Amino acid sequence: MENNNSEGNGNGKSLLQGEETRKLQYTGGSSYIVSLPKKWIQDLGLKQGDHVVILRQGNSMLQIAPASKRVAREQREATIEVSKENNPYFIARKLIALYFLGFNVITIVPKEDRLLVEQREVIKSIVRRVLMGTEIIADSATGITLQVLINLLDLSVDAAFKRMLLIAKSMYRDTLLSLQENNVELAGEVVKSDDEVDRFSFYIVRQLKIAIKNEHLLKEIGLEEPRNCLGYRLIAKSVERVADHAVVISKDIIENPHPLKKDIVEKIASMSYFALQVLDDACLSMFKRDYEAADKAIEKARKIDEMEKAILRAVSKPRDVNELYRIKLITENIRRVAEYASDIAEIVLNMTVQQTLRKG
């Protein structure tokens, strides 16, 4: 029986709490054997003959996990009971929270006779607009059942993020085009596209919450280590904010159909293209895990303040107050895009700084 005492391991070296030592045994040929802690076997419900997966991490560590955990699709179910007094958006928030927590089947049932029409409509709207991979499999006045059909491995976090970024950038470009052309219809399409970005954002949060509980799934869904989960969560939020700023500008175009002066629009376009370039640089540094590229993106983003000030100086002469307000609103939102790009690059620095250290 191996010593489980955290004070030492028989060699005069102290162990961290929870650590145990095992002796390597040589069986001849090219095989070595090491025993596994009995409690670990029991906790996971393993038995003789079951397979385990061994994954090498770095130069000196191995990760051992039950092979069944690779492909296990845990069917988690939850039921929400609602009363007639419950605001439909109270139900929606609870539904989203359960989606985030990784539940596969969610049933909404009434405490009284039936769900109100307004409650049912909001639930269906949330499923359609927000909960990616979710379908309504049963629908009646006495209850609605949702099932998350998309599998963890069907769409990796990396792939979901790329698609989310693509939509956000497309919204941003269309916003600029609608400003240049004074195209209210195109601005309206930008506003509608925001739901799609939110869907990807919620999906990414759900996948990260599931994966962080099962370390082996991290690599399966495209992540390298648990600490990257927080980084991805923050990056996804920043991209979501980029889309939000595109929506703010588009709504301004819809509400103020009178075009801005051409010379001002050209200056705004130049600033806008620059902010988009910073966003591209920051996200590329993330995909490539490139510390130096992320650092350059941060430095580049600093120039956006001066571009904004230059535009505001150009319109400082007396002019229509509403026009001045609009220009300030638009340039502020463009500046925020560059700032969120800088935030993304800073997260990449934190995720990749270890790569820059000299190995001793």
Predicted regions, residues:
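Short, intrinsically disordered or compositionally biased N-terminal tails of bacterial proteins
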Residues: 1-10
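Cytosolic, long alpha-helical scaffolding segments
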Residues: 9-24, 29, 35-360
